Amino acid sequence: MIQHVIPVPPLCGGREILDTKASRPLGDAFPKEPLGSAFVAYQDDITKGFFRSLKLISIAGNMIYCLSDLLLQHRNDRASHIALIDGQHRLSYAELIRQTERCGVQLQAAGVQRGDHVAIYLQRSVESVVALFAVWSLGAVVVIINDVLKNRQVNYIIDHSEASFLITDNRLRTSLTECPLSPDRILIVDSGELAGEKFTPSRVIGADLALIIYTSGSTGMPKGIMLSHNNLISGARIVTDYLHLTRDEIIVSLLPFSFDYGLNQLLTALLIGGTLVIQRSLLPADICNTLNRERITGMGAVPMVWQQLAGDRSPFTKTQFPHLRYITNTGGRMPESITKLFRQTHPHVQIYLMFGLTEAFRSTFLPPDQVDVRPGSIGKAIPNVELLVLNERGELCKPGEEGELVHRGANIAIGYWRDPENTAQRFRPAPFQQGKGGQTEIAVYSGDYVKTDEEGFIYFIGRKDQMIKSHGMRVSPEEIEDCIFASRMVLHAVAFAVPFDEVRSTIVIALVPSDHKSFSQKELSLYCKANMPEYLRPDVVWQLESFPLTSSGKPDRVRLKEMYTEQNQKF
């Protein structure tokens, strides 16, 4: 499958996880928490000086310590079950394991060793899944690169991550110039059969670094977030828990693996022994065809995709999907008008609204039975996480009081690769935990403003660096955008402010109309006047054909503001 290719090991080489206090293997004396056919054991673990809650997961009697175990647990009991569907290509768990181990042999032959950083620059595909698990089985670190990125961004990530090897294909390889790696370190995917040498996996433990995932760059140069095997397995387990997933799930993959939730969908599907269907086309008609053809049970997407599916020309709201059990939203707030529409057109489908940041994966989810009751809420903390809302003095906020969201507990990343300054700023000692003995617990200070209601449900206000001052009030861009979406006149909208003078700001709403021919700025202005208080109303309506997007499919707010500023400086 790959010239200089990629694979996985037999339960990670039979390694043991040691109790750090007693220096003995963890055994039955360790507490276990039932989870259907699975159980979880907890251990306090120290990872690079940070306190972590280590979760060990058992499915069908096999302990899961590292990511390659997600596959290997199914070697016998799910061998013939379909693990991946990519167009006409259907791969069983047995074949996926075989291809991964074969790929690992070639990676070893190419010189990949434990601890090496290996960049993967491929589209979502069977080949990219094989590459991921082959690298992990060797104890190497994946640096995942979105295939929509261009030469400059790809070379930056390869260089900054200190990648020793690059796995790509001929199509993407030809687009790369001035690559920091020598040609013998660039491994090209092909479809050839490989020699049958025996694969020898490396010893891997859960605390090992598994992934460096680069942020989309919507807030400046992308930062490399370091995630351990424990981080990624814990994230998959927690999502499995609150979505109530079973091994009968057929999950459609719309999001890139370089986006944390896109990768989580893959890991979750493999954790439960389900099926992942890779869907590259984001055209509403193509998505709808896949939902019914493959009998999809679960789908996750970002607001841009939901807005397209909710459009007047989309078949999504006019088609029934009897097998679809749930949908999840992440990467931004889903407009209330869209959740109401989906509740009307697909009342049997459960809607999970989620919120998180890559540094802690997921922080909150709003259960489906609360979507109608608490419009605008992002929910409460996910399992094994505590969320605190702190004011500028570091004190707990009262209900209704705005403050910064602080995440403590599961899923906290190791830090930023080669960026100690930003690591120290974002990953800080957990509040109210100092002086309790033991290692210092680290929390993630999100930089997001939120508030809670009397029952503890959280409401997102906005990022610290994106808040808008209007008529003496602090306004969230999302609040303006929600009002604009409710008009049903626009497909996409982003609000931001630019200086008007030394004191005042101009609120700009950049938008893509639902129908360019019938759209009227005058009608939208009348709608805003009738439905929005003055401090929320945009001063400028900026109509565009399309938006620049980040690599994770979100509107690039920084670039939009730059484009508007550049355009208006010409006059």
Regions found by a protein language model. Give the residues of each.
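Conserved ATP/PPi-binding loop(s) of AMP-dependent carboxylate-activating enzymes
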Residues: 380-384, 395-432, 475
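Conserved AMP-binding/adenylate-forming core of the ANL superfamily
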Residues: 59-64, 72, 80-125, 129-133, ...
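Conserved pre-ATP/AMP-binding loop-to-beta segment of ANL
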Residues: 80, 197-214, 220-221, 244-250
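AMP-binding/adenylate-forming catalytic domain of the ANL superfamily
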Residues: 532-554
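Gly/Ser/Thr-rich phosphate-binding loop
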Residues: 296-301, 310-374, 386
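Conserved AMP-binding/adenylation subdomain of ANL enzymes
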Residues: 233-250, 257-298, 312
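AMP-binding/adenylate-forming catalytic core of the ANL superfamily
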Residues: 166, 291, 299, 409, ...
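Conserved AMP-binding A3 loop
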Residues: 92-94, 210-234
